[in-house]
Amino acid sequence: MNIHISALIQKMEEELKKAKTAERDEELKRYVAVVRSLCDVVLDQPENASAPRIQPSVTPSPAAPPSTDQLMMEKMMGSAGLNKYRKQEKEKQEEDGNGESLFDF
């Protein structure tokens, strides 16, 4: 799926406006993460792509329904950007030992 860069830049500007008015740090970080992911999408797009790439859709695990944040991120970034964001969050979570297991110290 080819997304026009001007549409991505417009989304970045919207998220920056939201970030400027964020009242809590976690809100601010969420908006900045969306902007970062949109930047990654722009940088990862091939310059001379003749055929659109087909990306698999993200299927949430049945144990945990997707939160509104995840749905918003998927809508804004597409499935590839959301997967990249989730991977970064998982790596960050494992770094400091605050994983889902009781035995993570």
Curated annotation (Swiss-Prot):
InterPro entries: DUF5327. Pfam families: DUF5327. Induction: Negatively regulated by TnrA under nitrogen-limited conditions. This is Uncharacterized protein YwdI. The gene is ywdI. Residues 47-105 are annotated as: Disordered. Residues 86-95 have a biased composition (Basic and acidic residues).
